[in-house]
């Protein structure tokens, strides 16, 4: 049985950064019929978490205040709703919680059965918790938008991955190489060797003239760009794209949406495509299995106890994490 109260981190309004995070004791949530109550073993943060706090998606998210942030968790099922049939008490799982409700920075959380997958013993809680948003975003960008076959059977393509040392980026490099693509990647100078070690064929320091211009050292034009960085205008991408090259924007803002619309209206072959993550169980199970088979690795930037969750929040806000930031109750 779960305890009646749990430790959690909340914030009660927009803005404030780490100073607005409060450690509280709150009631353990009750699962609905299609939900699981999880005892959290590890959670991870994504940039969208602090952006929601900042108010980027107001008034849509969060749905109410106070809110417990975070969506990516691994844990053990301690209670299953009456309509749940894929899991039982004691099962180890990985889940993505709704951004509308959050809940990851706590000792317990409720997860929808249809957003939860089994975690095999070969995958640690930290490795599992790191996957949902970051690995699924990379997977969706490459398979749905770039049409890459991750078994390597498709036509060889040239891919650019920006912010390649971050959460999404480090998965995207590995998945793209499974798909037999030529990968050019950008990152900071301190991470050049790290990104090469993930399998990238060419790595650019984004602060150098070559990196800032996104020019392939071998002169290749990019069929697809998996774009997770910020502040790069369309005019920088366009001359580096192949005839029908596409930029897949993982964090589209108003300018990106205007570019997307304009390129559609003018029937341009070169396109900017905004990505909205749609988690799907088969994809979720696929990336977990890749970790199990040691074909995909989770690189952990740092681990923090829940009692020092504000340190993890500060780290994700800084924007320079290498891999994933883990919080453990």
Swiss-Prot record:
GO molecular function: oxidoreductase activity
Key words of the record: Chloroplast, Membrane, NAD, Oxidoreductase, Plastid, Plastid inner membrane
Domain of life: Eukaryota
GO cellular component: chloroplast inner membrane
Coiled-coil region list: none
Keyword Oxidoreductase: yes
Post-translational modification: The transit peptide is not cleaved.
Enzyme class: oxidoreductase
EC number: 1.-.-.-
Subcellular location, principal: plastid
Keyword Cell membrane set for record: no
Signal peptide: none
UniProt subcellular location: Plastid, Chloroplast inner membrane
Family named by the database record: Belongs to the zinc-containing alcohol dehydrogenase family. Quinone oxidoreductase subfamily.
Comment block on domains: Neither the N-terminal nor the C-terminal are essential for chloroplastic localization of the protein. An internal region (59-Pro-Ala-100) is essential but not sufficient for plastid localization.
Name of the protein described by the UniProt record: Quinone-oxidoreductase homolog, chloroplastic
Biological source species: Spinacia oleracea (Spinach)
């Amino acid at each position: 049985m779960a305890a009646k109260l749990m430790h959690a981190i909340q914030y009660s309004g927009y803005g404030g950064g780490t100073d607005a995070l409060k450690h509280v004791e709150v009631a353990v949530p009750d699962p609905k019929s299609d939900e699981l109550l999880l005892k959290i073993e590890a959670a991870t943060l994504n940039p969208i978490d602090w952006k929601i706090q900042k108010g980027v998606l107001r008034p849509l998210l969060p749905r109410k205040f106070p809110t417990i942030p975070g969506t990516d968790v691994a844990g053990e099922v301690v209670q299953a709703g009456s309509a749940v049939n894929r899991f039982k008490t004691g099962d180890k799982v990985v889940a993505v919680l709704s951004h509308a409700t959050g809940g990851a920075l706590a000792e317990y959380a409720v997860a929808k059965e249809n957003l939860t997958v089994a975690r095999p013993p070969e995958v640690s809680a930290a490795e599992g918790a790191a996957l949902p948003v970051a690995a699924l975003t990379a997977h969706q960008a490459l398979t749905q938008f770039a049409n890459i076959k991750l078994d390597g059977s498709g036509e060889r393509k040239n891919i650019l991955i920006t912010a390649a040392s971050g959460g999404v980026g480090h998965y995207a490099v590995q998945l793209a190489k499974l798909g037999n693509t030529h990968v050019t990647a950008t990152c900071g100078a301190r991470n050049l060797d790290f990104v090469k070690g993930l399998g990238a064929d060419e790595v650019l320091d984004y602060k150098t003239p070559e990196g800032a211009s996104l020019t392939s050292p071998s002169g290749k034009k990019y069929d697809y760009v998996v774009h997770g960085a910020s502040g790069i205008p369309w005019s920088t991408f366009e001359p580096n794209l192949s005839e029908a090259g596409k930029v897949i924007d993982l964090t589209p803002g108003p300018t990106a949406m205007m570019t997307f619309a304009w390129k559609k209206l003018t029937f341009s072959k070169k396109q900017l495509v905004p990505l909205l993550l749609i988690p799907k169980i088969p994809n979720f199970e696929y990336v977990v299995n890749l970790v199990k088979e040691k074909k995909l690795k989770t690189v952990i930037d740092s681990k923090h106890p829940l009692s020092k969750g504000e340190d993890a929040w500060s780290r994700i806000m800084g924007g320079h994490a290498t891999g994933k930031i883990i919080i453990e109750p």
